Design a protein with these regions (language model features):
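Hydrophobic structural segments
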Residues: 1-288
Length: 288
């Protein structure tokens, strides 16, 4: 079996820490470099439910997309939720490694996985990484549909292909408009509106769209895409877990490590229920 340090080196080759945003907190959080690794679990969030799942699985390494401590802390006491995660992992000899914004911009990265889940053909990054001469790394992806769909059909595909959440898919725009090109960005995306406009796509699928930015963007019809599709943050990033697991599986096979790599299907989206408004004449619209 490989040592943790060997597996981490392989993960760092996939998602180098130096490509993370300056504010981010990526890399190995807990773990003994010389410990042996057999089972690896991928998940979006390093929360207690996932730590407990890792224990039940007998995992030696937990790889998550979101950081455990994005901001500084003065305690890892087990009386705190994050401290309890740390204690659970250490007591059970489970290492924790985080790949966040360095996985967002990777080639392939979070948005490639999202595009793949929706059967979209990736054309280029939405926001190219200027440090990549090949022009393949960057934030978000500009994609083409193999065959045109209506906004309604694209939303239905997203609802079917992405993991189920209480939110589902919210839509702004004409549900019958035709979509041939779409920009996607896993995770929060309303900071990318200027890049979406510049890309000239028909639709933008992302997460965490706020009222005012979305309203202003949609109102500027001359420069905005036909539709906005807003999915749950967790759901747009979960496909990366499958991508990362497949990449590590390939590395394991190449090195003869015989790792057992798993993807958590535990839903850690914070929203647990949705109550629909009263029906209107337009099922995808809102009352006057």
């Amino acid at each position: 079996m490989p040592r943790l340090s060997e597996v981490i080196a392989a993960l760092d080759d996939l998602w180098p820490a130096e490509r993370a945003e300056s504010w981010d907190a990526v890399g190995t959080v807990v773990g003994e470099p010389d410990q042996e690794v057999l089972r690896v679990l991928f998940a979006v969030d390093p929360v207690q439910e996932i730590a407990d799942e890792a224990v039940k699985l007998g995992a030696d390494l937990l790889v998550t997309h979101h950081p455990l401590y994005l901001r500084g802390t003065t305690t890892v006491a087990a009386s705190t939720s994050k401290g309890r995660v740390v204690h659970t992992l250490i007591k059970n000899d489970i290492a924790l490694h985080v790949a966040h914004t360095n996985a967002d911009t990777a080639d392939p990265g979070v948005s490639d996985a999202l595009a793949g889940a929706l059967d979209l053909n990736v054309v280029r990054p939405l926001v190219p990484d200027p440090a990549d001469p090949g022009g393949r790394r960057g934030l978000g992806r500009v994609c083409e549909l193999p065959h045109p769909l209506t906004v309604r059909e694209l939303a239905a595909r997203a609802a079917e292909r992405l993991p189920a959440t209480a939110q589902g898919i919210r839509v702004a725009g004409d549900p019958e408009a035709i979509v041939r090109t779409v920009a996607v960005s896993g995770g929060s995306g309303d900071s990318l509106f200027a890049h979406v406009r510049a890309a000239g796509v028909d639709a933008f699928l992302t997460a965490d769209l706020r009222h005012h930015p979305a309203s202003e963007f949609s109102a500027d019809r001359a420069r905005s895409p036909l539709a906005l599709l807003d999915a749950a943050h967790w759901a747009t990033e979960w496909p990366w877990c499958e991508l990362g697991a497949a990449q590590l599986d390939e590395i394991s096979d190449r090195n003869g490590w015989d790792l057992r790599v798993h993807v958590s299907k535990t839903v850690t989206d914070p929203w647990t229920a949705h109550v629909a408004s009263a029906p209107t004449s337009n099922a995808m619209g809102a009352p006057n």
